[in-house]
């Protein structure tokens, strides 16, 4: 019995060393050039896997056009490239499919646990700012640490002597929304800009930026500073999972909550729910408690804010919808897959350490049995069984008043699914911008993670065609708001919210009209 701890220690050391060797091998491969023939094989592999598993590959691009793009790409590959250089050639072709969920994973450098711990004890260079992108311009809109006293509204003209416009033009080609709308790209690009940058240039200790503010140009050298003891204590405190943090889905990285609720007036007639991500974690408890409070307060108006919400759980939006309707409903149509074997292509053992691999192996027969009976055929197509396409009853605390929903280009995936359904059922007034996700559905659900044979780049392929249960618009666009109101950079800097302000003013106008109805003389 006493030998078990020793064996366990030996195994931990063994697997730790194996992990370090694996990381070293990966990083070496990442900087090693691949031959043109090998890259062309990776191109063919990518396209063949997309045709095999993607259930709506030619939704926004014809087969002839996509064939041409892949063939043209292969003709441009004439010299050896590193995996990351190859990524910047292949990803724009993947982007042309115009499916926002479909993207190669950029081959970033991997770090050992020791290196990760060292980085955790330092502040980031670029992550301490918040950004805004318009056209080919990048602006700082928030400087929480007052670094170099850089003012909100400052434009970054160059990074390490390379114009920012060049980065933006290059990185724009790597991302896309669902379909033909253009609202998603600036929202998503501002969030991933420095992910692309650090993948391309590494995690460095300093960077030089040239800026423009109020017609004055300045040069700053940003450095990766060590965190103070107070910073480290704050990091540790943020990791604690209190009951409130669980229910509101606390995010330590941003020191904020994914879900929040409040009344916007003293008499509690206006309820406000903000959801930054449909993460599902403790969401049932959140909505149960929230709508109980709204019902008790007898609120007349509800505002749901899903701006900058990139989506998430179908279960959560199905549950949320049950609080917004008085009739039984089916949120989505049956979800199509390419074949009955598709559910078994989801990389069951992906990212499993040796211990998890052993545990999952024991459970695999159950998983295999469940997935094997998870599909059915109808009218010549194959569908995956989903709870969200079954009839759902309205919740007993369902809101019966007037509902406003705030949307913008950052409303994507599940946010667009629920928005499209609410608009179709005439349950809400939509305020803001066209959503970044498509009105008529998307391809996501769960993924098959394919690794390209030579470059080792990962290609996650969505396996489910998920469509809201509506009459489709067939416009290849996002969900269009009833009232179009945009938010400027200056609005954000000054903490103004023209979209929410419009709703509040509309509600106040309705309240006054009810309080002082027009008399026969007025008419």
Task: Label the model's feature ranges.
Residues 19-302, 306-337, 348-349, 439-451, ...:
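Flexible, low-complexity junctional segments that flank or bridge functional domains
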Residues 1-27:
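Bacterial Sec-dependent N-terminal signal peptides
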Residues 154, 296, 314-492, 506:
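Conserved acidic, small-residue-rich alpha-beta core segments centered on
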Residues 6, 392, 518-519:
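Generic low-complexity segments that are intrinsically disordered, proline-rich and/or Lys/Arg-biased
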Residues 12-15, 106, 426, 504:
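Generic low-complexity, intrinsically disordered sequence content enriched
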């Amino acid at each position: 019995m006493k030998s078990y701890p020793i064996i366990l220690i030996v195994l931990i050391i063994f697997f730790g060393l194996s992990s370090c060797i694996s990381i070293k091998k990966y990083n070496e491969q990442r900087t090693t050039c691949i031959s043109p023939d090998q890259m062309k094989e990776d191109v063919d592999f990518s396209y063949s896997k997309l045709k095999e598993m993607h259930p709506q590959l030619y939704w926004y691009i014809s087969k002839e056009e996509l064939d041409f793009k892949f063939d043209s790409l292969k003709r441009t590959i004439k010299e050896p490239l590193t995996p990351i250089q190859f990524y910047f050639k292949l990803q724009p072709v993947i982007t042309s499919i115009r499916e926002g969920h479909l993207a190669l994973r950029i081959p970033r450098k991997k770090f050992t646990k020791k290196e990760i711990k060292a980085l955790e004890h330092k502040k980031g260079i670029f992550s301490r700012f918040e950004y805004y992108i318009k056209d080919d311009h990048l602006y700082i809109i928030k400087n929480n640490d007052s670094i170099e006293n850089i003012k909100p509204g400052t434009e970054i003209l160059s990074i390490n002597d390379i114009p920012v416009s060049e980065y933006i033009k290059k990185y724009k080609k790597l991302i896309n929304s669902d379909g033909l709308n253009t609202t998603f790209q600036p929202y998503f690009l501002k969030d991933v800009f420095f992910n692309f940058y650090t993948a391309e240039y590494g995690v460095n200790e300093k960077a030089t930026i040239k800026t423009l503010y109020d017609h004055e140009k300045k040069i700053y050298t940003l450095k990766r500073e060590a965190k103070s003891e107070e910073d480290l204590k704050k990091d540790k405190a943020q990791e604690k999972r209190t009951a409130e943090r669980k229910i509101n889905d606390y995010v330590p990285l941003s020191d904020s909550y994914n879900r929040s609720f409040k009344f916007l007036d003293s008499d509690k007639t206006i309820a406000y729910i903000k959801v930054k991500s449909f993460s599902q974690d403790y969401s049932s408890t959140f909505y149960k408690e929230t709508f109980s409070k709204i019902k008790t307060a007898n609120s007349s108006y509800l505002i749901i804010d899903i701006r900058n919400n990139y989506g998430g759980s179908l279960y959560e939006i199905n549950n949320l919808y049950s609080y917004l309707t008085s009739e039984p409903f089916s949120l989505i149509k049956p979800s199509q897959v390419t074949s009955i074997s598709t559910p078994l292509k989801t990389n069951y053992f992906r990212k499993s350490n040796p211990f998890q691999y052993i545990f999952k192996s024991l459970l695999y027969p159950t998983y295999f049995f469940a997935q094997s009976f998870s599909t059915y055929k109808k009218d010549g197509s194959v569908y995956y069984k989903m709870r969200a396409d079954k009839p759902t009853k309205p919740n007993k605390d369902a809101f019966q008043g007037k509902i406003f929903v705030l949307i913008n280009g950052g409303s994507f995936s599940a946010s667009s699914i629920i928005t499209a359904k609410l608009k179709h059922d005439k349950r809400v007034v939509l305020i803001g911008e066209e959503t970044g996700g498509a009105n008529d559905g998307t391809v996501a659900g769960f993924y098959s993670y394919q690794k390209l044979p030579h470059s080792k780049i990962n290609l996650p392929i969505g396996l489910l065609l998920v469509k809201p249960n509506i009459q489709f618009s067939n416009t290849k666009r996002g969900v269009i708001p009833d009232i179009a109101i945009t938010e400027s950079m200056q609005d954000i800097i000054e903490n103004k919210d023209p979209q929410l302000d419009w709703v509040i003013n509309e509600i106040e106008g309705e309240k006054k009209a009810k309080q002082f109805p027009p008399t026969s003389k007025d008419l």
